[in-house]
Structures are given as structure tokens and as C-alpha cells.
Amino acid sequence: MSFGRHALIGLLAAMPSMALAQPCTGVVYLTFDTGNMRHAESIAGTLRKHDVKATFFLANEKTARGDYSLDAAWAGYWKELAAEGHAFGSHTWRHGRIGPDAADGAVKYRPSFGQDEGRTVTLSSQDFCAELKRPGAAFREYTGRTLDALWRAPGGNATPGALKTAQRCGYAHVQWAPAGFLGDELPSETHSNEALLAQALRNVRDGDVLMAHLGIWSRRDPFAPMIDPLVAGLKQRGFCFRTLRDHPGYRAEQPPITLAASRSR
């Protein structure tokens, strides 16, 4: 990478206050799927640095430190993010790939973790609803609040039947915009961080939903350090960041939010 590009990334990352001074000419929605959580803390720090709220989609995924992302050991992390005003949706409990639609509203599902790992199973509509709701049960135990009525299928692959079943359970599916695919799961040998950053800064448009992970197994050179210059650069372009609670397509989907902390204020 050239010195000039290094300098640009460093300049963007170091200028949160100047970015905040820019007028808001558009809105983007930054979202994160759990992944292996290797960069969860650093990403949370970047969001605090820039005073940006994001939306997190939670699955109980195996982490880089050997536990699972919704184990009690992560309770403090989720509680802190909830207190900071971020939004949260379901990414299914076992991070399962959704297969072709089955009969009678059933969903074919291949869990990545836990029971039936690596096997395609058929979940009844009731069981699929339970799979969607289970991350919320852990989240509520740790934070005192509910998940927002949103979900994202692992890989973004949701069939018409799964979408319909989830909707009956009260969940709206959230896909990302084409320009919002930040590419953090692509091979770094062919998709450098600098190229992915430049592509996002060039192509993201008003209303786009952006997607990355809190850690990913499939990339050697992690993209997480680019979140800092990405946020700064988009602010320099005049974008404001909002959670999906403020997205016009999902606003009506939200149930009442219960925060244990709010009762003590």
C-alpha cells in the first residue's frame, strides 16, 4: 500500500470531531453479525470514539477465545452495548444455514454449532420460531431488555418460507445493501483492506444497510481496523449513522423495549 493511502486512513481515523461537524446529508445503518468476536471490544471502542450507534445481530457462535458469544462470560459486553443505545436482532441461535423450503411451513436448517452441528434438520414453524427467539432469552437475562423484532439469516440466505414463518413469529428480516457488504469475510489475499475501504467510501449511498462481523474466521488480515476510517470517511461525506430502529422500513416492527436499567433511573 502506498504512503499516501496509509496517510489517508490515518487522517480519517484521527478526525472524529471534524467529521461530527459536517451537516447530515444522508443516513446509513451500520450492522454487525456476531462471528467469532475476536474484534468485538475494538469495534465497540470505535463506535464510542465516533459516537455511532449500530445494530447487532446475535447468534451463539463459537468465539476466538473458545467460548460462545452468548455465554455468560459475554454478559458484560452485551449489557454495556445495550446501555449505550445500540439495537439488537436475532441471527438464529445456532447460526444455521437455511435450505430449500419444506412442506407445511417447516424450515430446513443446518446448524453451525451445538446440537445437530453440520447436519441438515427440518424445523417445524414452532421450532424455527424458538430458534429465532433463543438469542433474545439470553440477551434479556444479561441486559434486562428484549431484542428488537429483527432477524438476519446467516449468510443473508433466507427462503420465502423462512421469511414468512419468521414474520408470523414477529420478526422482520434485514438484508444489507449491495454497497453495504463490507467484504470482511472475503480473502485478504485478493481483497485488501485498503481496497475494501475505498470501495465502501466510494459506493455507499443514503439509506444503505452496511454489514460486517465482530470477528471472522475466513480472513487472514482482519478488516476490523478499517471500521474506524470507514466511519470517519462516511461522516466526512455527510452521512449520519442510525440504528435500524430508525429505519423507515422497520420502525413499525418494534415491540416495546424493556430496560431493567430504566426502572432504576
Located regions from the model:
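N-terminal signal peptide c-region/cleavage motif recognized by signal peptidases
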Residues: 14-17
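C-terminal domain-boundary segment and adjacent tail
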Residues: 22, 54, 64, 219-265
